[in-house]
């Protein structure tokens, strides 16, 4: 039986599902209506262990491939090195890139349909560095410094070393060099994508559509320990998001079933509260996209099992106080472990990754 052909509206709906924003929807529709083979990408820093927050953009890569977008996965080792990841150990950074691709494959993305590119190959090209300089010439120093939040750093941290100032221009140059129609990233990449759109007009380059996925809040949820008045939204998101540098705030794809259960059961999940609730976010962005429905299993004296066909219905019921946090957590742990099991099994079969995981665990930087 042949593969079903999706309409423009169906492709648009799939691409936009569970996104925080698309800049702009009209431009995306026009690109889809052009009937051209569209090129998209996501660049990722191989910077440590793969936590479940990354599964949000991994699912979106899967959606984009299904929607007929020719997706490139950029293994941004040089960017990770500039950003002082894994102690600047380039060999370890490259091992982390291999590990990430293995995770993406075992999550269910058809990596055979991805164009996997190493930053190593791009930076060897003299045309690339000429592009970096041209991008920098078309952006103010203040604009570049404001874009440092794409690295998980604040603008005032630009004084650490001068290489950090090259990073935003490199990311914009990646987009131009790969001749892309679509750039995918978390909401923390918004400033780089907006810079690319603005500079494109000045340089006569193709203006990308930028697709931003939400950042998964850490397991501490809305308990904002380091939030101060006057902080930009980017900095606030950086403080509360799930992060490799805060291991107890994160669930890693190679965590054991027991560790996943322990972390979920200890997570922030106040009764009837949806805002910054990590358990509800895991259900919305990771579990529901993989299943047609979710069953909350309960003892008959507490109302018995209840099924939900969409996230909105579940959230509404939770806010009304009709689902106990403990029942929600048990279901989340069970379904999340189902998703992570094939990833864990694959990693266990490759001893080189076990050694690398041990090294990375000792070397994780911000």
Curated annotation (Swiss-Prot):
It catalyses: tRNA(Tyr) + L-tyrosine + ATP = L-tyrosyl-tRNA(Tyr) + AMP + diphosphate + H(+). It is found in: Cytoplasm. InterPro entries: aa-tRNA-synth_Ic, Rossmann-like_a/b/a_fold, Tyr-tRNA-ligase, Tyr-tRNA-ligase_4, Tyr-tRNA-ligase_arc/euk-type, Tyr-tRNA_synthase. One of its GO terms (molecular function) is ATP binding. Homodimer. Belongs to the class-I aminoacyl-tRNA synthetase family. TyrS type 4 subfamily. This is Tyrosine--tRNA ligase. It comes from Saccharolobus solfataricus (strain ATCC 35092 / DSM 1617 / JCM 11322 / P2) (Sulfolobus solfataricus).
């Amino acid at each position: 039986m042949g593969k079903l052909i999706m309409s423009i509206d169906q492709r648009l709906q799939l691409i936009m599902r569970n996104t925080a924003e698309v800049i702009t929807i009209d431009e995306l529709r026009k690109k889809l209506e052009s009937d051209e083979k569209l090129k998209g990408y996501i660049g990722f820093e191989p910077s440590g262990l793969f936590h479940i927050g990354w599964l949000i953009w991994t699912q979106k890569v899967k959606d984009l491939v299904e929607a007929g977008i020719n997706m490139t996965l950029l293994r941004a080792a040089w960017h990770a090195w500039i950003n002082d990841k894994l102690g600047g150990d380039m060999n370890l950074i490259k091992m982390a890139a291999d590990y990430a691709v293995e995770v993406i494959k075992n999550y269910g993305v058809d990596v055979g349909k991805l164009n996997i590119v190493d930053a190593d190959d791009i930076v060897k090209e003299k045309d690339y560095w000429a592009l970096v300089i041209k991008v920098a010439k078309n952006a103010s120093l203040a604009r570049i410094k404001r874009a440092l939040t794409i690295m998980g750093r604040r603008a005032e941290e630009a004084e650490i070393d001068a290489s950090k100032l090259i990073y935003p221009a490199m990311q914009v140059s990646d987009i131009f060099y790969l001749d892309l129609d679509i750039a995918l990233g978390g909401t923390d990449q918004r400033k780089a994508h907006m810079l690319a759109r603005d500079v494109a007009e000045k340089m006569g380059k193709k203006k990308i559509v930028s697709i931003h996925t939400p950042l998964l809040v850490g397991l501490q949820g809305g308990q904002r320990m380091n939030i101060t008045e006057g902080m930009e939204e980017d900095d606030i998101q950086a403080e509360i998001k799930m992060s490799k540098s805060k291991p107890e705030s994160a669930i890693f794809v190679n965590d054991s079933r027991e560790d996943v259960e322990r972390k979920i059961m200890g997570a922030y999940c106040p009764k009837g509260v949806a805002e910054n609730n990590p358990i509800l976010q895991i259900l919305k962005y990771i579990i529901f996209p993989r299943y047609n429905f979710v069953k909350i299993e309960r003892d008959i004296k507490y109302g018995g099992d209840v099924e939900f066909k969409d996230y909105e219905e579940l959230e509404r019921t939770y806010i009304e106080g009709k689902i106990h946090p403990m029942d929600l957590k048990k279901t989340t742990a069970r379904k999340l472990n189902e998703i992570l099991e094939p990833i864990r099994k694959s990693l266990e079969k490759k001893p080189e990754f076990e050694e690398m995981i041990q090294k990375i665990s000792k070397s994780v930087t911000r």
